Amino acid sequence: SSAASDVYKRQVFVGLGWLLYVIVAQKFMTTKMSEISIYVTIAFLILWCGLLLCLQKSGFKKSVLAFAVIAMCFSEVIVSDCSSILITQGNSDYKSNYAAYRESIEAINKKDSDFYRTELTYLERRMDPSYYGYNGISTFSSMAYEDYSQLQYNLGMFGNRINSYTYNPQTPVYNMMFNIKYLIATPTNPTPTDRYFTEVYRNKDKSAAVYENDCFLPIAYAAKTHLKDWAADEGDPFKVQGDYFRLATGLDGVFVPCGYTDCSYDNLSGDTCSENGTFWFNKSSSDEQYGTVEVTISPLRDGNVYIYLASPEIKTAEFSGDGIKNTLSQNIEEPYIMDLGYHKKGEEIKVSLDAGSMSATESYASIYAYSMDETVFAKGYRLLADSALQVTDWGEAHITGTITVRENSYLCTSIPYDTGWSVYIDGKKAETFKLGEALLTTTVKPGKHKVELRYTPKGLAIGAAVSGTCVAGVAGYLILVHIRRKKQQSAG
């Protein structure tokens, strides 16, 4: 019939439309797409269109087609889940440190009732803060703020720029910015540097220890308004952190670039890496299974050395040399800042990049290595600590405290910007804005102030009004029905 023919045409055109969309989409591949996912999507499109066309033909049994539809749904879910879920550890490993971490966390809670963040020096899973029950910075959630995730990535955190970022021992500047007060480490995981952390608790069986940040800042503090010029662009995370510190305090040079004393290639050739930045290299054939790049760096002053490595092809890096007892290794597929420990001026650290797994004949690596100027950092920290919020009360949706400010300043927080957050200074609502495209910030004048931060989910008032109206409407309808029945019974 003409109607059936129209249905067939619509289904064919819709199927062709989706097929065209997939073909166009594969021209703009993202990190979440692959050639296999494109082919599987096309295959499912063809199968779904075929099933829908079969449903229009009377010759096919509806029960058989219904079973086929259910089977298709399950197949699609199985294919999707199997390709996206990666099991990295067994159940026993998953919970092996639970008792140790819980003892340490309970010791912290007993010692300190203030508002702060705690972290592990090595996270076994993205959601360790939820699993172990502590207030951390790490998260992996569909509700995470993408701008905040991007900022964390730009600051040198392990993450995906979208909805996940994971803490690894960071610089004192980062720990100060993001309210990190305690770190917990097991004997097999990295120990925080004693230059900035003090051990305050050790489990009875020595299964874990707690370290307190000597340069802790509360959730909010006053900083110079020059921060309006802060550009938190992706690239060199030390520049992003250093610019924040400079603009917030007026002190420059908290990070000092390391010197580069040597660059050598084994079974590769490439640029000479002589300073922080990006350098290119290549191998004679993509079939070559061996090749290394070795860069030697040397701090220009005493202090902790931090390094950040990124490459689209290199997966692992190793660090050895003066002051490093055992060779350190790092997976740089997802780059993040690594603390190489305290080193004296002139010591040499060898950075070895394994290029054996390169699938291309040419690639590049970005390397940024810095040491800390402890004197500059200490001065800047004291400036910010003197104008930090003294938290007096806090809960799930509010933080209250007092602050003393010397000059017109920004009231900076490590809270993700959300229009649901309201800031009240001395009872008056202040205008909030984004800092670094992600952080909740407002302005504050000189003097002593009472500050209150309140959170109300966006749309709560409208949602409550709509729900209340609906409830009232249903109640009114039921009352009218009840009255009408009464009248009918009386009339009868």
Language model features: what each stretch is:
Residues 10-16, 65-72:
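Central hydrophobic cores of alpha-helical transmembrane segments
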Residues 34-68:
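Cytosolic-side transmembrane helix boundary signature
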Residues 142-278, 282-285, 296, 312, ...:
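A cross-kingdom signal targeting lumenal/periplasmic-facing segments of multi-pass membrane
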Residues 20-31:
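Juxtamembrane "helix-exit" motif on the non-cytosolic side of transmembrane helices
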Residues 30-31, 215-222, 448-452:
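Short, charged/polar, Gly/Pro-enriched secondary-structure boundary elements
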Residues 3-8:
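Short, small-residue-biased leader/transition segments that mark boundaries at the very start
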Residues 71-92, 106-177, 217, 223-242, ...:
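Extracytoplasmic/lumenal acceptor-recognition loop(s) of multi-pass membrane glycoenzymes
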Residues 262-492:
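Active-site-proximal, structured, solvent-exposed surfaces of multi-pass membrane proteins
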